[in-house]
């Protein structure tokens, strides 16, 4: 039986909600490849995708909590790095809006799982909870 400590929730959930955006980032990468194949007939070059993924990971940290924020923050990347035109950009925004709730569910579930892992780590290494104002 795993019990999550309040201090882990207070620390882990806000941290992971801001930096752990697997649902948003993964779906956007897959949608970029799909839209590119459908509209332009080919996938982006592998090195272009590597650059896009790295930059998307950085840009996504600036957009947590905003519905569709990841795709809005990355529009410049989609246009400049991948070379999408207005049609590709519009299709990306439409598809992302349709599935954004599933990406959010993935993000929230992942945040809870990571908080459980953090609790397990603290328990395994005998890390004691410190009350606020208490001196170690």
Question: Over which residues does each language-model region extend?
Answer:
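Short glycine/threonine-rich loop-to-helix capping motif typified by GTGT followed
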Residues: 21-31
């Amino acid at each position: 039986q795993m019990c999550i400590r309040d201090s882990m929730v207070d620390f882990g959930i806000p941290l992971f909600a801001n930096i752990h955006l697997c649902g948003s980032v993964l779906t956007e990468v897959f949608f970029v490849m799909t839209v590119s194949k459908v509209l332009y007939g080919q996938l982006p070059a592998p090195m272009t995708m590597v650059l896009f993924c790295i930059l998307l990971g950085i840009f996504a940290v600036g957009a947590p909590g905003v519905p569709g924020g990841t795709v809005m923050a990355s529009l410049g990347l989609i246009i400049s790095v991948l070379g999408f035109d207005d049609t590709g950009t519009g299709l990306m925004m439409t598809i992302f809006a349709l599935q954004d709730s599933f990406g959010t569910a993935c993000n929230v579930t992942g945040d809870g799982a990571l908080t459980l892992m953090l609790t397990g780590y603290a328990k395994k290494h005998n890390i004691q909870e410190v009350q606020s104002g208490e001196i170690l």
